[in-house]
A protein has these predicted regions:
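Accessory, charged alpha-helical segments in nucleic-acid-processing enzymes
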Residues: 287, 460-498
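Conserved DEDDh/DEDDy metal-dependent 3′-5′ exonuclease domain
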Residues: 66-100, 105-179, 306, 314-420
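Metal-dependent nuclease catalytic cores that hydrolyze phosphodiester bonds in DNA/RNA
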Residues: 1-106
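Short cysteine/histidine-rich zinc-coordinating motifs and their immediately flanking basic loops
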Residues: 26, 205-214
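An active-site-proximal beta-strand-loop segment
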Residues: 82-88, 288-297, 302
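Long, highly charged low-complexity segments
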Residues: 223-297, 313-314, 334, 478-484, ...
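Acidic, Mg2+-coordinating catalytic module of metal-dependent nucleases/exonucleases
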Residues: 147-154, 158-209, 229, 401-469
Length: 498
């Protein structure tokens, strides 16, 4: 079977995706994947036009010709070239030909790849090396350089392909071995799922199987180790957790994350606490959620939800272009300065990076200001949750945790990658409906953040302090209170084997 560039790229992201593509299976669709495909094609066309402007028909050809007499070839650029060998195939975006500089010196052939992103990845470089390998074998001569043109500025990166050739060769061997059988590779969910056309298919199958890869953060090594002892499902893993008494010298240090405890929380549908996590907010909470385009390091929407004396205000700071970024940062600082003792609450590293970059680009507020104090001590809820609070959810993502708490987004498909599609769509058409979808998604994230914060304040309340809602006490389990016992003692059936 021919290994195409399309199949090779899929394997780099996920073996299952590679297998499904090789069998021409149709995906259920993915808005982000569809958008990337459309934008990539448009970017390729624009890039080709830039390269060919002013060139004669002799200088640019639409296919690789004259391979038998490469020295006398007149063209300098071949477009959309189908390169093939016995088992490899790649539709190369363009091939640049640099004529020989004298007798005995061969012309150079450089495969060119157009990439929409500003920030390149290892996958992009491996794909360039794959193009070079196929072209080299087709021409019967070394191809030592690949070229990637990428991003809004059409930047150029040269890839030294010989250092990647061995790896590409080994990967193609693995792909060939996998595709030589009809056995579907093990289903493993990963970070690429959100960008894949097979996302809903694989997610459904993983849930049906109660597959271990549903647990976010479980590494391949950890999964294989569990598989080696007969543990393949989340439920099976849950029976392996055993509470242990920590040495006194370690009691003030945070425990490592236990995937088995998360599995137990899911099985029992209860929140489990490790140690004595505590979240107290001494001041007025400002629930912050920022939207941006990571590939461009551009932040275009700051949402801030503030509750004062029972009334809620939702602030929306929108940037039409990168020139407006400084303005919305200044407006945000002004909002903070108008709040009595503000406490910034956010979820994850995205906002942490946002603070650092805004300080670096535009400076911070005066040292003695209210805003400066708030920015020095923001509360990242994920640092409170990680390895201390185990929700009965597969991940610690805001959406999963808030859904468990009973919150629902008005658009169930709204997500971080979907927001990227919305923003790019808005930039092209300036449709107010698209902008409103982004603003609403951001506002609902802020609302979900408030709900999760209130829940954490409640469930991490120190012992001895009266609880606001004691009715939910049975839904929270302290690991320290769990009975320590040897699992599967004599006469007890092992549930893992069931």
């Amino acid at each position: 079977m021919q290994i195409t560039g399309h199949i090779f790229e899929a394997y780099l992201n996920c073996p299952t995706k590679c297998f499904l593509r090789s069998r021409n299976e149709a995906g259920a669709g993915n808005a982000y994947a569809d958008w990337v495909r459309t934008e990539t094609e448009a970017y390729r066309n624009t890039s080709i036009k830039r390269l060919t402007d002013g060139a004669s028909s002799e200088e640019c050809v639409t296919e690789l010709v004259g391979t038998k007499d490469l020295k006398t070839a007149k063209w300098r650029l071949a477009l959309d070239v189908m390169a093939q060998t016995r088992n490899l195939e790649s539709r190369i975006h363009a091939i640049e030909r640099i004529p020989s500089e004298g007798r005995g010196k061969a012309a150079l052939f450089i495969p060119v790849r157009f990439v929409l992103r500003n920030k390149l990845t290892k996958v992009d470089k491996l794909l360039s090396a794959f193009d070079a390998l196929v072209l080299s074998e087709m021409l019967g001569r070394p191809v030592s350089i690949g070229k990637i043109i990428h991003g809004v500025d059409y930047s150029t990166l040269k890839v030294k392909t010989p250092s990647l050739r061995n790896r590409v060769g080994k990967l193609t061997e693995k792909i060939a071995a996998m595709l030589s059988t009809d056995v579907t590779p093990d289903l493993v969910l990963n970070r690429h799922c959100g960008e894949c056309e097979f996302q809903s298919r694989c997610r459904q199958k993983a849930v049906e199987k109660n597959d271990l890869s549903l647990l976010s953060g479980l590494t391949e090594k950890e999964r294989k180790k569990s598989n080696s002892v007969g543990i393949f499902t989340v439920t099976q893993l849950s029976y392996t957790f055993r509470p242990r008494r920590r040495p006194r010298r370690l009691r003030n240090k945070r425990e490592r994350h236990h995937h088995s405890l998360r599995a137990l929380a899911i099985r029992e549908k209860k929140i489990h606490l490790v140690g004595n996590p505590e979240l107290t907010l001494e001041g007025t909470p400002v629930y912050l959620d920022v939207e941006g385009l990571p590939d461009r390091d551009f932040y275009y929407l700051i949402g801030a939800r503030i509750r004062r004396e029972g009334a809620v205000s939702q602030h929306v700071l929108w940037a039409d272009t990168t020139k407006d970024e400084q303005r919305i940062w200044s407006d945000f600082l002004a909002i903070l300065n108008g709040v009595e003792n503000p406490v910034l609450v956010h979820y994850g590293r995205f906002e942490t990076t946002f603070f650092k970059r805004m300080h670096g680009r535009y400076g911070g507020p005066p040292e003695d200001s209210v805003a400066a104090k708030a920015l020095k001590t923001p509360v990242n809820l994920l640092t409170v949750i990680f390895a201390q609070v185990y929700f009965p959810t597969y991940t610690n993502g805001l959406k999963e945790v808030a859904l468990f708490m009973g919150f629902n987004w008005s658009d169930i498909k709204a997500s971080g990658v979907q927001s990227i599609v919305w923003r790019h769509t808005w930039e092209q058409c300036r449709d107010p409906v698209v902008k409103q979808a982004l603003v609403q998604y951001n506002a609902e994230d802020c609302e979900a953040l408030e709900i999760v914060t209130n829940a954490l304040v409640e469930i991490t309340r120190p012992r001895g302090r009266p609880s606001v809602d004691a009715s939910k006490a049975d839904d929270v389990v302290s690991v320290e209170s769990m009975k320590r016992q040897r699992p599967f003692s004599s006469g007890t059936a092992c549930p893992i084997r069931r």
